[in-house]
Amino acid sequence: MLDVITKTNKSELILGGQKSGKSRRAEFLARDWLLQSPDHKAILIATAQPWDEEMQQRIARHQRDRAERVPGLTTVEEPLQLSQTLNRLSRPDTLLVVDCLTLWLTNLLMPMIGENTINSPSNQHLAGYFTDYAAMLSIAISKSAGPVVIVSNEIGLGVIPMGHEVRAFVDALGKLNQDIAQVCNKVTLMAAGLPLSLK
C-alpha cells in the first residue's frame, strides 16, 4: 500500500469516499518520511472545525489515533487560510499533510450559507470565490519546498441529493479536486483501504 515520498514524487492527492483509507494512507506516508531521516519533520494541517458534539468527538478520536500511529506527526489547526499556512510551513525537510480539502471547502462555504449567497442560482459569486482560493492553493502546492500530501473526498460517484446547496458544493469540490490533481505529481484513489494510482 505504501509508496515512498521522495524529491521526485513530492506531492500526492489522495481521493476516496468515507472510511476508504484516505487519512490512513496520508499518515503512512508521513510515518515513512519521518523514518527516512532523523532530520525529517512532518506536520498535519487539520481543517476540521468542531461545529457540533459529534464533530468534536470525531476530531478527538482522530487526534488520538494519529498520536498512536505517527508519534512524530505535529498537528496545526487551520480551517481557512490553507495556502498561507502551506507557504509559511514549507521547508525541504518537512512533509506537509492537508486533511482535508472537503472540510476546508465547507468552512469557506458556511458564511455564504448564512448570507443566502449560495441559494441564488443566478449568483456567479460562488464560482469565482472558490476559483480564487483554489488558484492560491495550487500555487502553494507547486511552489512548496518540501513534499505535500493532500487528502480530499470523492463525493460525485453516487446519487446527488436534491437541493441547490448540495449540488453547488459537489460541483465546487469536484472542480477543486481536478485543479489540485493537475499540480500534484501523484494522484491516488482509495477504496476499501486499497490504493488505485490515477497519476
Description of each model-found segment:
Residues 45, 75-77, 97-100, 150-151:
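Short, conserved beta-strand edge motifs with alternating hydrophobic and charged residues
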Residues 72, 92-95, 144-149:
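Loop/turn-to-beta-strand initiation segments
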Residues 4, 8-90:
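Conserved P-loop
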Residues 40-43, 94, 147, 186:
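Residues at the starts of beta-strands that form the adenosine-phosphate
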Residues 26, 62, 97, 153, ...:
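Residue-level signal for inorganic ion chemistry
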Residues 1-9, 132-135:
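SAM-dependent methyltransferases
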Residues 79-80, 88-112:
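A basic- and aromatic-enriched beta-loop-alpha substructure that forms the phosphate/nucleotide-
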